[in-house]
Amino acid sequence: MSKRLLLFDFDETYFKHNTNEEDLSHLREMEKLLEKLTNNNEVITAVLTGSTFQSVMDKMDQVNMTFKPLHIFSDLSSKMFTWNNGEYVESETYKKKVLSEPFLFEDIEDILRHISAQYNVEFIPQRAFEGNETHYNFYFHSTGNHNNDSRILEALVRYANDQNYTARFSRSNPLAGDPENAYDIDFTPSNAGKLYATQFLMKKYNIPVKSILGFGDSGNDEAYLSYLEHAYLMSNSRDEALKQKFRLTKYPYYQGITLHVKEFVEGKYDY
């Protein structure tokens, strides 16, 4: 039997920010299942996240997660880490692919200044950036008018593309620590993002799309989930538009993942 690939967004999907005592039993059940499937050589697991690698490690420690996904694609899947001999090691192969084109913070600042001046708006860095980043993320607070927000953000994406840069936007998620009524603005190299990471793994392991199951909860999961035949939006998602587009997990968070992974590996979604 060929291996299956399991893909998880991290914040508010694989990891619940407000995990309580009641949730822990469901978390342990999820980890036990993933450990068993991994040990039986049935699945390959990967986390695809907009968070930094260190943020993922810190959050896993918060709830004492013990299962180690084989791959973690951090910084909006612009960095790849693989579990190897008791530690995560960054992939140099993936790094070379990501950095095959120029990606300079000064250029991104110029793009943001141009749009800021044109529309009299502000873009706020989400964190302190270091040198040679592969993911620069900002907040854009809503103007109070959805159509106006879309006009500004789509202009940003177009202008960035004209400068040979890739910009994405999605609704911020307050449950994951984001501000209310805001958008995430993400700049990554062209060879990055959750869909790119998905296709990279498909090629690496020679896995067809029918053998992949993906989970997500927010706008930056839309492209990769849309690409898959078997994709679930978490029922705890706050994105009403995405809820109309994707199948919802029967249960939220850990319970939902456990149920649908079980059904997937049992062949209930095969056709």
Swiss-Prot record:
GO terms for molecular function: magnesium ion binding; phosphatase activity. The keyword Chloroplast does not apply. It is an enzyme of class 3 (hydrolase). Keywords: Hydrolase. One of its GO terms (cellular component) is cytosol. Coiled coil: none annotated. Transmembrane segments: none annotated. CDD domains: HAD_SPP. It comes from the Bacteria. It holds the Pfam family S6PP. Its EC number is 3.-.-.-. Belongs to the HAD-like hydrolase superfamily. NCBIfam families: HAD-SF-IIB. PANTHER family: KANOSAMINE-6-PHOSPHATE PHOSPHATASE, PHOSPHOSERINE PHOSPHATASE. This is Uncharacterized hydrolase SA2005. It comes from Staphylococcus aureus (strain N315).
